[in-house]
Amino acid sequence: CIRDRQSSALSSVDINDSVHYKGYPIYYKDKLYLRPKVLTDNLRFASGDLFNERDVQQTYSSFGRLSALKYTNIRFIETQVGDSTMLDCYVMLTKSKHKSVSFEVEGTNSAGDLGAAASVSFQNRNLFRGSETFMIKFRGAYEVISGLQAGYSNNNYTEYGVETSINFPNFLFPFISSDFKRKIRATTEFGLQYNYQLRPEFLRTMASANWSYKWTQRQKIQHRIDLINIAFLYLPRISERFKEDYINKGQNHIFQYNYQDRLIINMGYSYNYNSVGGSIINNTIASNSYSIRFNFESAGNVMYALSKAANIRKNSNGEYAILGIPYAQYLKGEFDFAKNIRIDYRNSFAFHAGVGIAVPYGNAKTIPFEKQYFSGGANSVRGWSVRDLGPGSFAGNGNLLDQSGDIKLDASIEYRSKLFWKFQGAVFIDAGNIWTIRSYANQPGGVFKFDRFYKQIAVAYGLGLRLDLDFFILRFDGGMKAVNPAYETRKEHFPIIHPKFSRD
């Protein structure tokens, strides 16, 4: 049986004050770091309960979720009371550093255009003495853009942004009882973001707000529910030259759609499973492991139903609008699988496969640009630059706009080997592409068709070098094109037969 009382076990602890809350004695030094209710709500056993190891582990897990705490230690001391053996329980908590400031500086190279970005963030891990985590981050970026035609006012790209969030270590929802909230071990997050982008072609601002929940199940499964996410995209200025060249011609409905003011109101759910849970030490997986990720997102359905019910008149483009601003409507789903196969201490294989699809309907004919897929780059098919591959067999037309799609397939296999010190080598093969759901005249070959999509899978190969510094991994990859779906002739379709560094 467990009981709570003061004992000589506290003689080694530096304390000078105490308080009683709901029958629990709480000892501390100078100032109580967390509210008493926070402490008692995270206990999974009470005085008088029979000892249960599962309750102890759940208590460790509950306190481990609190970012305001660094260490948790639960001690039991046997005490004889008459003919019974009792356990005196002491939960000892060590606070973490609750305030921190961090800086980040990065250099960018987008197809030869050099730039720089910097950010500063502040974090408070105990804002209201309940282990609430508050974060605010400021970011700025600058890039010189080359290859512009005449008619643009400048040749640089400037971006400013600020984001802030507050994370509560418990489930918050109105009209829900305290007992129910205590049983659901979820965190609640509220966030705000604002972004300002000034390019030669346009000036765009984006503002968003979100409300989400996250919780962990059996240490291996993570759930996230985005209850609501509201984003507003506003373009106060678009270059006349840009309108003339790309928008007013009416050749590409995607461009027209994405350079209009837009409202996105969406909700979603994501599921993540990792077979090793929290047993990863120094970025080294102790045994074979795998992970599964699933994500689902929908937008505009509630607003569309209300618009229909209220018999609201559509605008000139055939869209329902809120205060004159049309809203997006779509469904988006993603599935991702990754597996690590350890051969021995020095060698392993890593496999990854993913698929994603986004379908516009109802109030929209196109997916918002921010929700579309792109291919190429360090986290995709590494033989192509970011947003340089696809859609389908489309080779690109050299304009300023990135190519994107509604469907994405990705797969890779990588052999990794420890070289020396903290360096690791890698050999990889990547495959994948993106496609559009609808056919567009200025993107020939970009639409997805079952009888030919497999012929449009791009393949790349290459070598990589990893510097594993435990707290982060520095990665260098060099990829070459092996199969290029943009060309049909044998020599250009299979560049692996005739490799050329300047081309591939």
Question: Which stretches of residues belong to each language-model region?
Answer:
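Residues on the lipid-exposed face of transmembrane beta-strands in outer-membrane beta-barrel proteins
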Residues: 118-124, 162-168, 192, 209-213, ...
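Transmembrane beta-strand segments that form the barrel wall of outer-membrane beta-barrel proteins
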Residues: 76, 99-109, 118-120, 131-150, ...
